[in-house]
């Protein structure tokens, strides 16, 4: 047997033998180990990311997770390759890799939590305003604000942005916004007049 086959056998033993060691750290080690072995001509990175997700599912004792480590790594490709190069070049210390991996898991979990919060808030908002008679333009703008989340729509919504988004006149935009304000769908922010902007009435989504 060649070196790769021997290493793969050790690798499979590592990921399959039950242990009380920290599952998140084991997921980090498994990912790095597979990348270093590099058993395939192509696709080693994708397989390593899939292995990470599998190991994290085991660590959390759940077949379903609300975040994807594969996606999180794809979103941080530059730092991912930087830390891999640092860890696999002239050192046997993998502490920096484990720290990066665990921080990326934490970031993925936080982002998933924020996404869930947005989805829940959006559902609650529309449930609360289910009986409001809103035109397609108003629904489009409200969905854009809801999808952006709290403070996510820079500068808030105003008549100019509304008119541009809905391809309508400023007069129509102002009338629609005033109607949304009267119906409690949005709240005003700013000093008033031309500087007035609007955001979703987030209190109604709690």
Language-model-detected regions and their locations in the chain:
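Short acidic, hydrophobic short linear motifs in intrinsically disordered regions
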Residues: 151-165
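Short alpha-helical segments that sit at the start of domains
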Residues: 116-147
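Short coil turns linking two alpha-helices in DNA-binding domains
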Residues: 169-170
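Short, hydrophobic-biased segments on the C-terminal half of alpha helices
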Residues: 177-178
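Phosphate/pyrophosphate-binding active-site loops
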Residues: 1-116
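Short, cationic-aromatic polyanion-contact patches
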Residues: 158, 188-206
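Glycine-centered, phosphate/nucleic-acid-interacting loop/turn motifs that mediate DNA/RNA or nucleotide
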Residues: 184
């Amino acid at each position: 047997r060649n070196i790769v086959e021997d290493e793969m056998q050790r690798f499979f033993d590592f990921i399959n033998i039950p242990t009380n060691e920290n599952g998140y750290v084991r997921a980090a080690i498994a990912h790095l180990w597979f990348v270093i072995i590099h058993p395939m001509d192509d696709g080693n990175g994708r397989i390593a990311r899939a292995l990470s997700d599998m190991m994290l599912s085991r660590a959390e004792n759940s077949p379903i997770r609300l975040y994807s480590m594969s996606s999180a790594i794809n979103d941080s490709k530059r730092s991912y390759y930087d830390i891999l190069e640092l860890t696999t070049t002239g050192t046997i210390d993998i502490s920096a890799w484990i720290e990066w991996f665990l921080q990326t898991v934490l970031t993925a979990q936080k982002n998933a939590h924020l996404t869930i919060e947005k989805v829940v808030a959006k559902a609650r908002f529309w449930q609360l305003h289910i009986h409001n008679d809103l035109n397609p333009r108003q629904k489009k703008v409200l969905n854009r604000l809801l999808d952006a989340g709290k403070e996510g729509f820079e500068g808030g919504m105003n008549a100019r942005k509304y008119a541009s988004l809905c391809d309508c006149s400023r007069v129509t935009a102002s009338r629609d916004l005033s109607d949304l304000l009267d119906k409690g769908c949005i709240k005003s922010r700013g000093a008033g007049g031309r500087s007035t902007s609007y955001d979703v009435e987030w209190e109604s989504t709690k």
